[in-house]
Structures are given as C-alpha cells and as structure tokens.
Amino acid sequence: MDDEVAALVVDNGSGMCKAGFAEDDAPRAVFPSIVGRPRHQGVMVGMVQKDSYVGDEAQSKRGILTLKYPIEHGIVTNWDDMEKIWHHTFYNELRVAPEEHPVLLTEAPLNPKANREKMTQIMFETFNTRAMYVNIQAVLSLYASGRTTGLVMDSGDGVSHTVPIYEGYALPHAIFRLDLAGRDLTDYLMKILTERGYSFTTTAEREIVRDIKEKLCYVGLDFESEMGTASSSSVLEKSYELPDGQVITIGNERFRCPEAMFQPSFLGMESAGIHETTYNSIMKCDVDIRKDLYANTVLSGGTTMYPGIADRMQKEISALAPPTMKIKIIAPPERKYSVWIGGSILASLSTFQQMWISKQEYDESGPSIVHRKCF
C-alpha cells in the first residue's frame, strides 16, 4: 500500500450512505441510500431525462419519482441499484477513481454470508479497487468512542443490534440483532398520523414523515405519565409545515413513535425491546466481564439520536440489572456518524495496513476470501 493514497471509507446504511477519506474526522458525503425512477412519461423534448436518480437528487425530485431503498434491514436486496449508489459515491460525491484507492466497507452483524461475498466481488470486478475490507458496524462505533471494551447498541434505519466487545474481540455468541429500526418507526408514524386524519401513502410522502420524525420525536422517560400529560394539556403539541404550506399538529405521536423501540408490540412484533436486548446480550457474556459492559454501554446510529433515549435506557437497564451494579450509558454527540468515524480511524492505523484484501489475493481465492480475512 502506498502511503500517499488515502483509503476510502464507505458506511452503507439502509437509510443513509456515509462516505469519505480515512483520517478525516467526518464523512465528506452523506446522502440517502435511495434510487428513484420516474413514474411518468417524459414529454419535454430536449430535456435530459435520466432513467434513474440517486441520493439527494432523487430526494429533491421525489414528487415525480418512485423511490426505492436497495438496502433493507442491513441486507442488500437489489444489487443493480446498490452498484448505482456506489458509482454515485465514488464518481459524483467523492470524485475519485476507485481503482486507485483501498476501500473499507461496513455491514451489519449476522448478515447472510453471500452479502459480503457479493460486496467483495463488485468492488474488485466492477470498480477494480486495489484492496478492500469489510468490517462490522458496531465494532467501528466502539473504536470511535476510544474504547476497546464495551457493549454497542447500534440502531440505524434498517437494523438494530447489540454487540458486546471485550478487549477488541466481538463476542459472536452474545450478539443480538433486531430487525426493528428507523424505517419501521417512520412507517409506524405514518400509520398513527393517519389516525389523526393526515394521510401519507406514497414513497415520496414517507420521506416527509421521516423528516417529521427526525425533527419532532423524542423518547419519554415514563410512557404512561407522558400519555397522561398529552391527554390533559396541549403542552406537548408541536406544529410542522408540509412542503405545500399546510400546517399539521402532532402531540402524543411525538413519543409514541420511538416508544416502539422499547415496546415492539406497538408494531405487532413479538421481540424484546432495545433495553431487554441489551440486557440479554450482557447476560450471554461471561460473568467476569459483565461489570465492564454495564459501565460501558455505547449508543450509536441515527435512531439513537432521539432526545431522552439515554436516560430511558439508563432507567430500563437499571431496573433489569443487579441493584448494586454501576450502569453507564454513553451517548456521544457524533453518534450518528460514529460507525464512519471508527472506519476512518481503523483504515488509517499503520497496523491495519496488512489486513486489506488485495486484488491479487482476490484473484487467487475468489469472493470467499472475505470470510477468512475479515472478522
């Protein structure tokens, strides 16, 4: 590896793609992982009409497009669209030639093996990268927080997971994955806004609801008492202006929506909430290291950005854990991008340079090399 060439770090989330150069302290490009296709026939002669739009451009033209997310629950479901997103990342956002750089990609834990094999194949065969590596998202978040031991509760748009890490080793038997994350909350908010008489149905309108969610939702410390406050006064009501100037008011939806993270039964799911999952993850670990995990529980990902979520986690886990246990929930302010930041740190370490999968190794072994070289 030449020292002059910076590695590219691409954190392909289900909702947002974060990309940039190793050693930077923040991603240069952050755009929605969306591919949009026109839903109408073009009639203007001479206008350049594309058959697909990616990222922010798709978002800005969403009124005439059908929007699709190629990554669902952390797993790539449409590889052609995924290639478009990577192409857009390299050539339009970062403006680099991928064949000149090593590329670090991220993925959710407990993903199907074929997912990372295909990622590897596309990087080497379509984009001709010099070298690449795939890392687990939660592990990178822990790097970013400057720890080597801790439990990461990472929740993005497509998938949430709890990953206990001890002295830099992830403990695979204690990793829990929850297919309940930001996108499910957006859908749930669409549903409960319908009860108020506001109808949001199209893929474009879903993006409006996502914006409402990001701007106005919060996690209540005590759900029942928040509900009481909401029904007896209008102190919790907030208004939101839609793109057409119409103003809508939302009240208890503000905390009912993220409450589903703690009570998945709201979404008709039978799984445990994020607090129980975190606790179960710790309990699956060796009794000697639990204390360190309780004291170093790190939140990461966009769905942990709700105000009040850290206090609520503290309260819920304290109720489950032994009474004398010291519990500390760490919510770094940059946690929206901590996976990317961790990747940037990792890819710039001198000790990491022998870890890359080189083009030569790929040519000798094929895509399955990724399971041997990457944890």
Swiss-Prot record:
SMART domains: ACTIN. Its EC number is 3.6.4.-. It is found in: Cytoplasm, Cytoskeleton. Polymerization of globular actin (G-actin) leads to a structural filament (F-actin) in the form of a two-stranded helix. Each actin can bind to 4 others. This is Actin, cytoplasmic. It holds the Pfam family Actin. One of its GO terms (cellular component) is cytoplasm. It comes from Styela plicata. It catalyses: ATP + H2O = ADP + phosphate + H(+). Actins are highly conserved proteins that are involved in various types of cell motility and are ubiquitously expressed in all eukaryotic cells. Keywords: ATP-binding, Cytoplasm, Cytoskeleton, Hydrolase, Nucleotide-binding. GO terms for molecular function: ATP binding; hydrolase activity. It comes from the Eukaryota. Its main location: cytoplasm.
